[in-house]
Amino acid sequence: MAGHSKFKNIMHRKGAQDKKRSALFSKLSREITVAARMGLPDPAMNARLRQAVITARKEGLPKDNIERSINKAAGGDGANYEEIRYEGFGPGGVALIIEALTDNRNRTATNVRTIVSKNGGNLGAGGSVSHGFDRLGLISYGLAAGDAEKVFEAALEAGADDVSSSEDGHEIWTAQDALHEVAKALEPVLGEPDGAKLAWRPQTQVTVGEDDAAKLLKLIDALDDDDDVQTVWGNYDVPEEVMAKLG
């Protein structure tokens, strides 16, 4: 976890990739199926599905799995998933937004509440923390896309609102309703992104010390282990020296 970029501090990684590959594939497949059901089951005609497929390919999801997930939606097979959001607080007073795709609201609510409470946090009512975040589009690129100047100029030309570059890559922020339009405009210049999705960006961040950081990351890992949880967003900032100690 060392070397977190600003965004990786906001959105905790999906566990150790080598240990959680099958779980990650399951989440990616679920997002593809949901995206296909929400529009046409054709990536060329469905912007959310196209980005889900691009992200899945970047993460190494086999082509057969991608096609099977799309066909499942087209054929009306499998569970009907709905998007659910939970809000609350973790150790150190960190605000958390937990996004899930579930076919059973009661199961997911019980699991999420149990995980949060067992790890030093508590869930609040809807809207209890989201007022402290901005709902924006986020497009992520690796360093191979180009240097900071090239990415900034491309993002500006494409209509992005903000760009952040670091040793970990580039984060391009857009208005919520401009995400897919900007992502499409960037591809001829920067290539396919590592990811493009709606995100929750905190208006302010909470610096977390070593003790609270260890508890917080344990909580986020536990949430990530739940099959229904897709993404965990937070307003925490863990200093590099603390991250190094925690490994």
Curated annotation (Swiss-Prot):
This is Probable transcriptional regulatory protein Swit_2142. GO terms for cellular component: cytosol. Belongs to the TACO1 family. It comes from Rhizorhabdus wittichii (strain DSM 6014 / CCUG 31198 / JCM 15750 / NBRC 105917 / EY 4224 / RW1). GO terms for biological process: regulation of DNA-templated transcription. Residues 1-21 are annotated as: Disordered. InterPro entries: Integrase-like_N (IPR017856), TACO1_YebC-like_2nd/3rd_dom (IPR048300), TACO1_YebC_N (IPR049083), Transcrip_reg_TACO1-like (IPR002876), Transcrip_reg_TACO1-like_dom3 (IPR026564), YebC-like (IPR029072). It comes from the Bacteria.
